[in-house]
Regions:
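Acidic/His- and Gly-rich active-site-bordering loop/insert found
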Residues: 1-118, 128-137
């Protein structure tokens, strides 16, 4: 059984959080930062991206399809997002984009909503694929 390297998982999560993927209500965002996100994920989770199909949607949206044993079964759909709101005018106890660890807690914008879910899902997929697991049905993420 493949082991999850917790230290490496935390480092990858911190890297995700340190990317300032800020979008505002007016649709303003830094295109370079968003364009760098998928290549970063591919580098951090090479096993996932060797096995799953990935598709860009509207330039920065990412859809992954992990083909299961029986595609006639209804698929599972998991969702998250990696854009965050900015930290301007907010009083953060720790810098919002440094992903610092204090008392066992990672402090960063997006750590709960929802880069944490993105990281957890990719870590699980990386481990399961390394073990040779194929899901019983297709999984979209």
């Amino acid at each position: 059984m493949a082991e999850i390297n917790n230290e490496r998982a935390v480092e990858r999560f911190q890297a995700m959080l340190r990317k300032r993927t800020v979008s505002d209500k007016d649709g303003n965002f830094d295109r370079e930062v968003f364009a760098s996100y998928l290549p970063m994920l591919k580098e951090m989770y090479p096993t996932v991206f060797e096995v799953v199909e990935s598709q860009l949607i509207n330039e920065f949206g990412i859809v992954l399809k992990w083909k299961g044993k029986d595609s006639s079964l209804n698929p599972v759909v998991l969702m998250s997002h990696y854009d965050v709101v900015g930290d301007e005018g907010q009083d953060w106890e720790h810098p919002a984009f440094e992903a610092e660890i204090h008392d066992g807690v990672i402090w960063a914008r997006g750590s709960i909503d929802t880069k944490g879910l993105l990281a957890a899902t990719l870590e699980a997929m990386e481990k399961l694929i390394a073990e040779g697991y194929t899901p019983p049905r297709d999984i979209y993420y």
